[in-house]
């Protein structure tokens, strides 16, 4: 299959384009996703190509957007819905938890909610406290939801196509800092302009990436780093700069979790560091630490370390002090190696 060099934005648009063409039941909607093409231009050109009945705008009502999507899914459509920022999902919480996640269970399988809820998440664009949150832990503990976060254009397209085809409701979190290329997380360097970021080769047509399989992005033997989204690149840079032979695992799917890959890696290395951008207390990293303790306790050579955002709102002026950069991750890698 031919490939094209794409950003994550372009890869996501390509995924929706492929599925709109393949399946007449697929519809795309949300705030400003029609003619405007979305606040990040992920849906640019799709309404022109497929018409206003397939790609259309929604009122500024997250609860109404999700509730409508649940109804569409119950009656045969496959909605791909955008919440403009993950920070805005809170008004839709009841629809997500009580309706979207539980429809199949509550109807004894008579109805399903095969919808994909796309949400840009995380910091790195100076969005401040209301445009920078990483709320993944709130979704992973809701029974009935799948939660996905890609870290690169190839995975973004393949995971989004797989999500649209899935009969389960999927929370699809998109790290904004990666929209136009990878980022190494150094807050003590000028932020690389998006136009200069390297892109990735992405197949032009249809393909999928499994919704429940992690990827080892950097093989290693000394310590296992469990991470996802933007911090995948931070962990890779930290491993190189610290000189620690770290194995970096990109979870890709936060739930269901690829526990087999995690356990196999930690049993091999005997050490584990968990890295994510969200706040520390009750963050998804706490669940990862618990699972590693349960399944790998007798193989551990050192206590598990966590490197996360701080337990504060996301500060605009101090964004890079909040963000877990390579220096903090590198210090954790060295710490577990000293035990």
Curated annotation (Swiss-Prot):
Catalysed reactions listed for this entry: N(6)-[(R)-lipoyl]-L-lysyl-[protein] + 3-methyl-2-oxobutanoate + H(+) = N(6)-[(R)-S(8)-2-methylpropanoyldihydrolipoyl]-L-lysyl-[protein] + CO2
Keywords assigned by UniProt, alphabetized: Oxidoreductase, Thiamine pyrophosphate
Enzyme Commission (EC) number: 1.2.4.4
GO terms under biological process: branched-chain amino acid catabolic process; response to nutrient
Pfam families: Transket_pyr, Transketolase_C
InterPro entries the UniProt entry points to: THDP-binding (IPR029061), Transketo_C/PFOR_II (IPR009014), Transketolase-like_Pyr-bd (IPR005475), Transketolase_C (IPR033248)
Coiled coil residues, start to end: none
The keyword Oxidoreductase is annotated on this UniProt entry: yes
Main EC class the enzyme belongs to: oxidoreductase
Cofactor: thiamine diphosphate
Gene3D superfamilies given in the database record: 3.40.50.920, 3.40.50.970
Keyword Oxidoreductase on entry: yes
Matching CDD domains: TPP_PYR_E1-PDHc-beta_like
GO MF term set: 3-methyl-2-oxobutanoate dehydrogenase (2-methylpropanoyl-transferring) activity
Function: The branched-chain alpha-keto dehydrogenase complex catalyzes the overall conversion of alpha-keto acids to acyl-CoA and CO(2). It contains multiple copies of three enzymatic components: branched-chain alpha-keto acid decarboxylase (E1), lipoamide acyltransferase (E2) and lipoamide dehydrogenase (E3).
Assembly notes: Heterodimer of an alpha and a beta chain.
Record PANTHER family: 2-OXOISOVALERATE DEHYDROGENASE SUBUNIT BETA, MITOCHONDRIAL, 2-OXOISOVALERATE DEHYDROGENASE SUBUNIT BETA-RELATED
Protein name stated in the entry: 2-oxoisovalerate dehydrogenase subunit beta
Native source organism of the sequence: Pseudomonas putida
Source taxonomy: Bacteria, Pseudomonadati, Pseudomonadota, Gammaproteobacteria, Pseudomonadales
Gene (UniProt): bkdA2
